[in-house]
């Protein structure tokens, strides 16, 4: 069976040496999965997880009134069917959204006063309309008001706790000050920081700081609890006159012995005085059974009591907790006969006194005072009461409605502080706060590490779903307030849920988010790559993110954790550099929002095929080998030591210590960068430009996939959604330019399935960037297609591969100065062959409104215009399709009523001759703007419901209806044929149980005889279920089932199409005051011309400087002229050598193509062609494929390859120098890749050999036609009366200060006077000039420029009385 060449990836020779381990995940899954998790559409209401919309509803509901006598509870939500489909939304300027209904329950309670209990009085449940919610299209975009938009994912700081220091910059002493910050997902921030005196302070929400112990006391901790939590204590006792302390090994480490420590039994000195207690010494003491050691009084002086020291006899407090012990105190303790007491262990080396010092400066004693102090700091001016202070403090950190750490925040907090708090505890706990402070104090004491906020374990991605979830919550909270008010104002028992709920605030928030949020962007639809990249973009900007001005270098920089997650290359140039990034090819986002990348697991020095995804935190500490580390056939590493990544550094690691290995070399770059062959030979700055410029390539009329690609082209084209992909396996039944019909294979659907797929192709639609979207079939009738095969190419795709530019023959040499400084010299051949011609589609819209003076009308009857002007308008006043239009031509005729004004004599005369009509309307027709010249390719008319339709509308509707009816008939025909085929298999050859008569009584099927196909077809299909089969009851059942299904399907199809036609004929929803809206589409063909910008894929860009006749171009020995001449000096300083390697490999690919063409022309035997192809490909799978081909199929393949054999040189594992030379050899070229060129003008050979080859060159969106602009007369600024600036405003050219100096330097006084007066802002002079020119006089009288009047007014506004005195000469 014929398979289409389009879907054979083997035809591209691949240089990759590493076998593909896993497929690249779908490129737009980041968008689709996020929104899927948000809506949970395919999950039944009761099984929905607590995430997305469900989570928002459950967190805001139930809503109770203030007295808690009623509550509104959430049950479930459901989405309806969108009113318009995607296509209709595009055309009508609507939003593709589904209506949402929420089922809520209103419960009313009776409150019994006596034993304060509640009993349910009433429960009402109801579905309430809750506004519309935009749906995502198949391709991961949203259609808002008729335009496609993308919600860019945001990269923001993850919630959790972060430790940092100021690098010694805050205080003049250069002391390093540590700080901690607890950031929740929503709620108040909590900051702890040390000052230069080592006092610990706390800030809530970045307000004024206060001692940290105020907060800790507010949590209910007393001074002694705090001291004993943060400090260890030592026990000291008296033994006669001596002081002793208990030898606690943990505390003794690193202390010094004050006196000799002697074994009392043997007298052996275990530790000498002034020596440190080492681990060995402590062990020795334990062996000798020493439990306590002598200390001197000096050592105890200045120590701090860890508890109150109380005289047991009298109960008198001798020393308070946190009091320093003096000689007097110690004597008193001893005198009172207290045997032991405890002091805090503070040595100011390993344990500092910062927390104790903080307690000392903190004058607040009780919890209540602490709460009131916090209230005063947060609400200055409010009179504090204990109740309000407690409520405020509880709400700050412990109320789930006000404070939410989120699962991620809790995870990070537990991870950093080593806590075991369950993940569903989303608020702070007292334990959290203590541990945060403890870690901060440890950090100051030299334990623990600070966090790197640019580490991808500390930054997470908020994709569409989560961003919308946050907006939805805001809307619901606004709605909640309104509901509470309504509940308290009205009698609840008389109300239904819908009386309480007004979904306007929610709809408004959603609408605002999609319409005007910084992250909701107009989709970049220039070409398929730009679409995919836009959907995979990560932005650090946006609400809750960074701002360009405040972002420093660190945030923008590449970080080791970006490896395999975020592309180090692709980012914009300019102020956003580093703030906007792109997801790497294999990366995905996990449920916590962290970016993960896949690795192969390594076990005992052997690589397995098992692949696991790791986030940046999970991979920490693992040794990870590169994808190109050499392994043998068993997967064992060849070398003993392997270069690997570990904790952000490259280290040499023994093979047995390796734990992970990259899955592919291109894992670390993004989609756009992975499309650049020989990326490894380009400088990073140029690679950045290359990946950005590929996104600006305009789709060309004739797409041409690159001869030298990377193998990613097919993936991008498939996932971008611009090409049409088969939904099932099947055979192509019919193909034309606008649709493909595929009959599905039998094993693909069950017996009752339909068995037909109809694909309607998009023809010449306009993209967001005015480029042309057009789909072309690549399959023939009878081709067999497999699921997910490409059956039609979209814009910039060729045979299912991305094709952004053209393969052209380039030579690197200077040529007459025309390629100086990145200019490009091109051959006229490229223009003649339409190689770089692109189609651009402009949309023009004209609206007829109902004005105060009467209705506007769209008509061909326009006053004061000749026949010639109106020749292309039809009777409805709309231009005909196919008309060639130029600037100034009328597209849509429209007249607007005008108020009665004083008539001029001419108008009076016209009125007298033609009656009323000509006078009371003015011509407001839509005309073609300057710079647009093209062909009208379509018109759409939208008219108000109930308005009369004009002839053109009826014509358009009729054509649409015919198209729909044809689809309907085809679908029914194929389903019917398929069903008949199945029924024939069942019935033909079976024995009839009864005879079957036609309507005329003629016997069509004889009883007891086998049914023939002829006899069967003489019976109408609808009555086949009446045929009864002998000996087999199942056949009758199956026949009835198939016919039943057939009729059911036909009914469904008819219903669907009738509905579409009904919609077509219905009037349109137009904005208020609009009677009719007409859109006209003009296709503009842009050929390549001087001034257009072109670029390669390696950041090598330039502007076309001259188009040379092909006979003047330098030519090869066989007479072929080159097509583009580039300057060789553009390569060395820019260090993008990849373009040269691409040129060489392209030359080889082309040469091999010429060899194949030569064989075909000479009618070489099949075997010879096969052998040559096998030699070129050198690949077992390809050999197998070639051997399986029949003669005709082989010829088709060879014909396809004679343009050149496509090569894939994947990123970081591309063709080596040796590989390129080998290919050049097979093509019959010299291995240098250089040839002798001849001058096209003289025919003389150039002195040196020149590098010639095939380079893939793109035409970028910066077209000179869009930029060139000229003006004679036009609009003026209101205040200054000077011409406006810019093409969009049809402005003039600015003659600035420097230009005036130049004119002065040349002494061109009169020209300059004209420039500054009559040609600019001298209003009276302009008019005089016009009159003079009309009357044929050429005198110039400049007057006073308007800007002078502006200057005078400005001076007057400063209070200076300036007036202009005119000197009247007698």
Swiss-Prot record:
GO annotation terms (biological process): DNA-templated transcription
Q: Which PROSITE patterns match?
A: RNA_POL_BETA
Catalysed reaction(s)?
Answer: RNA(n) + a ribonucleoside 5'-triphosphate = RNA(n+1) + diphosphate
The EC number(s) attached to this protein equal 2.7.7.6
Q: Which Gene3D superfamilies match?
A: 2.40.50.100, 2.40.50.150, 3.90.1100.10, DNA-directed RNA polymerase, beta subunit, external 1 domain, DNA-directed RNA polymerase, subunit 2, domain 6, RNA polymerase alpha subunit dimerisation domain, RNA polymerase Rpb2, domain 2
Q: Which GO terms describe its cellular component?
A: DNA-directed RNA polymerase complex
Mind listing the UniProt keywords for this protein, alphabetically? DNA-directed RNA polymerase, Nucleotidyltransferase, Transcription, Transferase
Against InterPro entries, the record matches this protein to: DNA-dir_RNA_pol_bsu_ext_1_sf, DNA-dir_RNA_pol_bsu_external_1, DNA-dir_RNA_pol_su2, DNA-dir_RNAP_su2_dom, DNA-dir_RNAP_su2_hyb_sf, RNA_pol_bsu_bac, RNA_pol_bsu_CS, RNA_pol_bsu_protrusion
**GO MF annotation, one:** ribonucleoside binding
Coiled-coil annotation reads: none
Q: What does this protein do?
A: DNA-dependent RNA polymerase catalyzes the transcription of DNA into RNA using the four ribonucleoside triphosphates as substrates.
Q: How does it assemble?
A: The RNAP catalytic core consists of 2 alpha, 1 beta, 1 beta' and 1 omega subunit. When a sigma factor is associated with the core the holoenzyme is formed, which can initiate transcription.
Q: Write down the HAMAP family for this protein, in alphabetical order.
A: RNApol_bact_RpoB
Family recorded in the similarity comment: Belongs to the RNA polymerase beta chain family.
Task: Please identify the protein, giving its name as recorded.
Answer: DNA-directed RNA polymerase subunit beta
């Amino acid at each position: 069976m014929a398979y289409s060449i389009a879907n054979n990836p083997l035809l591209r020779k691949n240089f990759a040496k590493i076998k593909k381990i896993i497929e690249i995940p779908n490129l737009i899954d980041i968008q689709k999965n996020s929104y899927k998790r948000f809506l949970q559409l395919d999950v039944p209401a009761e099984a929905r997880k607590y995430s997305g919309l469900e989570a928002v509803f459950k967190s805001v509901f139930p809503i109770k009134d203030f007295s808690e006598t009623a509550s509104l509870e959430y049950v479930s939500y459901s989405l309806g069917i969108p009113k318009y489909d995607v296509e209709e939304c595009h055309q009508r300027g609507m939003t593709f959204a589904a209506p949402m209904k929420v089922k809520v329950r209103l419960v009313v309670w009776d409150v019994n006063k006596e034993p304060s209990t509640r009993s349910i009085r009433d429960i009402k449940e109801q579905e309430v309309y809750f506004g519309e919610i935009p749906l995502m299209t198949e391709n991961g975009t949203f259609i808002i008001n008729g335009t496609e938009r993308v919600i860019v994912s945001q990269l923001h700081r993850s919630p959790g706790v972060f430790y940092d220091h100021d690098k010694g910059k805050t205080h003049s002493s250069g002391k390093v000050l540590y700080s901690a910050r607890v950031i929740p997902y929503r709620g108040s921030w909590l900051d702890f920081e040390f000052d230069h005196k080592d006092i610990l302070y706390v800030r809530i929400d970045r307000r004024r700081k206060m001692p940290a112990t105020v907060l800790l006391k507010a949590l209910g901790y007393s001074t002694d609890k705090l001291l004993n939590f943060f400090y260890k204590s030592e026990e000291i006792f008296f033994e006669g006159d001596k002081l002793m302390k208990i030898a606690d090994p943990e505390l003794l480490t690193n202390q010094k012995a004050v006196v000799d420590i002697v074994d009392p039994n043997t007298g052996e000195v275990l530790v000498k005085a002034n020596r440190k207690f080492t681990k060995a010494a402590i062990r020795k003491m334990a062996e000798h059974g020493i439990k306590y050691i002598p200390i001197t009084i000096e050592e105890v002086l200045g120590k701090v009591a860890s508890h109150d020291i109380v005289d047991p006899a009298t109960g008198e407090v001798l020393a308070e907790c946190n009091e320093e012990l003096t000689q007097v105190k110690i004597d008193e303790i001893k005198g009172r006969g207290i045997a032991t007491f405890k002091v805090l262990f503070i040595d100011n080396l390993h344990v500092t006194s910062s927390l104790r010092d903080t307690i000392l400066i903190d004058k607040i004693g009780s919890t209540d005072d602490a709460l009131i102090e916090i209230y005063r700091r947060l609400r200055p001016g409010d009179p504090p009461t204990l109740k309000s202070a407690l409520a405020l403090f509880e709400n700050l950190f412990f109320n789930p409605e006000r404070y939410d750490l989120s699962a991620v925040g809790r995870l990070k907090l537990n991870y950093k502080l080593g806590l075991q708090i369950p993940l569903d505890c989303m608020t702070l706990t007292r334990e959290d706060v203590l541990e945060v402070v403890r870690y901060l104090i440890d950090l100051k004491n030299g334990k623990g590490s600070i966090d790197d906020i640019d580490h991808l374990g500390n930054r997470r991605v908020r994709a569409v779903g989560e961003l919308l979830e946050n907006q939805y919550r805001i809307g619901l909270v606004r709605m909640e307030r309104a509901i509470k008010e309504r509940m308290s104002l009205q009698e609840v028992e008389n109300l239904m849920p819908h009386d309480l709920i007004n979904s306007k605030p929610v709809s408004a928030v959603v609408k605002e988010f999609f319409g005007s949020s910084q992250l909701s962007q107009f989709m970049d639809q220039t070409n398929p790559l730009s679409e995919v990249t836009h959907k995979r973009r990560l932005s650090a900007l946006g609400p809750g993110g960074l701002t360009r001005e405040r972002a420093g270098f660190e945030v923008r920089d590449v970080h080791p954790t970006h490896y395999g997650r975020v592309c180090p290359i692709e980012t914009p140039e300019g102020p956003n550099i580093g703030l906007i990034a792109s997801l790497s090819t294999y990366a995905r986002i996990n449920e916590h929002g962290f970016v993960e990348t896949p690795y192969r697991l390594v076990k005992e020095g052997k690589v397995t095929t098992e692949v696991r995804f790791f986030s940046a935190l999970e991979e920490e500490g693992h040794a990870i080998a590169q994808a190109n580390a050499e392994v043998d056939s068993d997967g064992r590493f060849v070398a003993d030591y392997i270069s690997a990544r570990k904790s952000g550094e490259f280290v040499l690691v023994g093979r047995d210590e390796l734990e992970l290995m990259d899955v592919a070399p291109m894992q670390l770059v993004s989609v756009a960068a992975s499309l650049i062959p020989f990326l490894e030979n380009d400088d990073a700055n140029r690679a950045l430009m290359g990946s950005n410029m590929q996104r600006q390539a305009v789709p060309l009329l004739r797409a041409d996939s690159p001869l030298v690609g990377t193998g990613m082209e097919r993936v991008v084209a498939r996932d971008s959604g611009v090409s049409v992909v088969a939904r099932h396996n099947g055979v192509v039944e019919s193909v034309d330019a606008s649709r493909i019909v595929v009959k599905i294979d039998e094993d693909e659907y069950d017996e009752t399935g339909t068995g037909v797929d109809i694909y309607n192709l998009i023809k010449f639609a306009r993209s967001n960037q005015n480029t042309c979207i057009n789909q072309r079939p690549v399959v023939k009738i009878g081709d067999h297609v497999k699921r997910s095969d490409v059956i039609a190419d979209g814009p910039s795709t060729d045979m299912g591969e991305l094709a952004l530019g053209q393969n052209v023959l380039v030579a690197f040499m200077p040529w007459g100065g025309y390629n100086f400084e990145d200019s490009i010299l091109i051959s006229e051949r490229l223009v003649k062959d339409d190689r770089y011609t692109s189609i651009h589609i402009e949309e023009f819209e004209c609206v007829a409104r109902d004005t105060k003076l009467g209705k506007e009308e769209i008509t061909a009857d326009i006053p004061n215009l000749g026949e010639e002007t109106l020749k292309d308008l039809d009777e409805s006043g709309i231009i005909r399709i196919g008309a060639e239009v130029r600037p100034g031509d009328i597209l849509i005729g429209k007249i607007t009523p005008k108020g009665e004004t004083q008539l001029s004599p001419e108008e009076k005369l016209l009125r007298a001759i033609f009656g009323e009509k000509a006078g009371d309307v003015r011509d407001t027709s839509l005309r073609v703007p300057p710079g647009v010249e093209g062909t009208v390719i379509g018109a759409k008319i939208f008219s108000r419901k109930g308005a009369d339709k004009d002839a053109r509308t009826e014509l358009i509707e009729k054509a649409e209806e015919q198209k729909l009816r044809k689809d309907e008939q085809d679908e029914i025909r194929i389903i019917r044929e398929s069903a008949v085929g199945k029924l024939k298999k069942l019935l033909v050859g079976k024995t009839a149980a009864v005879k079957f008569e036609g309507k005329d009584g003629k016997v069509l099927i004889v009883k007891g005889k086998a049914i023939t196909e002829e006899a069967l077809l003489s019976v109408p299909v609808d009555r086949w279920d009446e045929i009864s089969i002998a000996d087999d009851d199942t056949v009758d059942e199956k026949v009835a089932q198939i016919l039943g299904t057939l009729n059911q399907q036909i009914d469904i199809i008819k219903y669907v199409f009738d509905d579409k036609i009904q919609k077509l004929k219905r009037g349109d929803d137009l904005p208020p005051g609009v009677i009719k809206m007409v859109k006209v589409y003009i296709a503009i063909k842009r050929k390549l011309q001087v001034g257009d910008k072109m670029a390669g894929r390696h950041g090598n860009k330039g502007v076309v400087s001259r188009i040379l006749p092909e006979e003047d171009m330098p030519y090869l020995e066989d007479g072929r002229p080159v097509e583009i001449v580039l300057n060789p000096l553009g390569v060395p300083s820019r260090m993008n050598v990849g373009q040269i390697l691409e040129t060489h490999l392209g030359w080889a690919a082309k040469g091999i193509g010429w060899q194949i063409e030569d064989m075909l022309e000479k009618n070489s035997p099949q075997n010879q062609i096969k052998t040559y192809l096998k030699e070129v490909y050198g690949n077992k799978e390809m050999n197998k494929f070639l051997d399986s081909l029949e003669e005709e199929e082989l010829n088709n393949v060879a014909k396809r390859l004679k343009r050149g054999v496509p090569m894939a040189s994947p990123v970081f594992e591309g063709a080596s120098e040796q590989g390129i030379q080998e290919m050049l050899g097979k093509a019959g070229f010299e291995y240098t890749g250089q040839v002798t060129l001849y001058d096209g003008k003289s025919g003389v050979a150039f002195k040196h050999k020149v590098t010639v080859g095939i380079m893939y060159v793109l035409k970028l969106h910066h077209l000179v036609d869009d930029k060139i602009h000229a003006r004679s007369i036009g609009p003026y600024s209101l205040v200054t009366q000077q011409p406006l600036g810019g093409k969009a405003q049809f402005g003039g050219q600015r003659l600035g200060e420097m230009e005036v100096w130049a004119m002065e330097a040349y002494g061109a006084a009169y020209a300059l006077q004209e420039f500054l007066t009559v040609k600019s802002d001298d209003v009276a002079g302009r008019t005089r000039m016009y009159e003079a020119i009309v009357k044929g006089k050429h005198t110039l009288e400049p007057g006073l420029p308007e800007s002078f009047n502006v200057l005078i007014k400005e001076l007057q506004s400063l209070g200076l009385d300036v007036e202009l005195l005119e000197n009247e000469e007698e």
